[in-house]
Amino acid sequence: TIINVKCTSPKQCLPPCKEIYGRHAGAKCMNGKCHCSKI
């Protein structure tokens, strides 16, 4: 899932991804946007 959060590193994406998927969230930063996934 691409979320509308700008990022330069995956660490910035983890908090918003955890809000969506809980503690089993995976976060990636691609093309300046956060991509969340459920692990």
Curated annotation (Swiss-Prot):
Pfam families from the xrefs? Toxin_2
State the GO CC annotations: extracellular region
Q: Which UniProt keywords apply?
A: Amidation, Disulfide bond, Ion channel impairing toxin, Neurotoxin, Potassium channel impairing toxin, Secreted, Toxin, Voltage-gated potassium channel impairing toxin
Where does it live in the cell? Secreted
Q: List the disulfide bonds.
A: 7-29, 13-34, 17-36
The record's comment about this protein's domains reads:
Has the structural arrangement of an alpha-helix connected to a beta-sheet by disulfide bonds (CSalpha/beta).
The protein's name in its UniProt record: Potassium channel toxin alpha-KTx 2.12
